[in-house]
Amino acid sequence: MESIQIHDKQFVPFINRDKISRYVEFLANQIAEDIGPDEVPIFIGILNGSFMFAADFVRNYPNDCHITFVKMASYEGVNSTGKIKHLVGINEDLTGKTVVILEDIIDTGNTLAEIYEIFRDKKVKKLLIATLFFKPDVFRKELPIDYIGKSIEDKFIVGYGLDYDGLGRNLPDIYQLKL
């Protein structure tokens, strides 16, 4: 892995694809063990960032499951705007279902708070949150995160679905903003 440039920023190698695969496999197996083989959960990926994570996750999930997506956004450039844009909703009836949210990254918790707000009236059996990456230093909400692939520092990252102004999602590895 070599340093890369996206738009006007330099990024350095941070987490390679093999480690990412191990985090995803760990999460899929842990959630499958906790939910059990008789429950058919609905996994909900948060677009656009979680599309790679969600795809690899369900490939690793050993039991039956459903998957769908919702689109929300809180970033412009490398900074969180603090404002959530709820762009595409959920059409499935979630009443009495176990729902697992698949997030690419949780930092401030603003998107997570919006997720909890959306699901408050859905009458789900259980709502679980799984994130591939978590930035505990900037997390400001009193909300549970049930599964964490890896905790990282508060530095901007791209790759494996995460972007910088629309670019970098296709990278198979994770890169960190060079300061």
Predicted feature locations:
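PRPP-associated nucleotide enzymes
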Residues: M1-L179
